[in-house]
């Protein structure tokens, strides 16, 4: 692998999983060095907890792949934190990465509290600090998660990574936590 610092992912669609040999697709991903599956329910037009994906999640759990999903956007409600809680609870050994601190656009700590309690949940901070002026709710949300379960993310190409990094460093977070 030319860039071992990057962890590549594939994707799969709920309709494809229901109609095709998704196990072969996941095996192909693993054979080609992909370690996880990224889904974006808003763009792919299905719910994060669509039961057609449950056999896929079960196979991912069995083969130690991880799931990363866009999470949030209360305007459409196909990927809210409640849906990620359902998946992470049904598959407790599946590592799940919820993007945008677990609830893009709904910056209320209470909404993500059930998500933050699950040991197999990780989050990234992509597109979290770019849309709001008051950072306090976001910092409160971050405080609910195990700091070892929070990843930097830029949401590239929507946001330039260096600008997101600058905003993150300007938050005044203790340097040890930023590591």
Report residues per predicted region:
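Short secondary-structure boundary segments
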Residues: 41, 127, 154-156
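Mid-to-C-terminal alpha-helical segments outside catalytic/metal-binding sites
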Residues: 144-151, 158-179
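Short, flexible active-site loop motifs that bind/organize anionic cofactors or intermediates
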Residues: 43, 128, 168
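A short, conserved beta-strand element in the Rossmann-like catalytic core
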Residues: 47, 157-158
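Catalytic pocket-lining loop regions of alpha/beta-barrel enzymes
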Residues: 35-36, 46-151
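Short, aromatic/basic amphipathic alpha-helical patches
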Residues: 29, 111-114, 166-172
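Cofactor-binding loop segments of dinucleotide-utilizing enzymes, especially the Rossmann-like FAD-
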Residues: 11-13, 101, 155
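Mid-domain alpha/beta scaffold segments of enzyme catalytic cores
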Residues: 1-55, 59, 63, 121-124
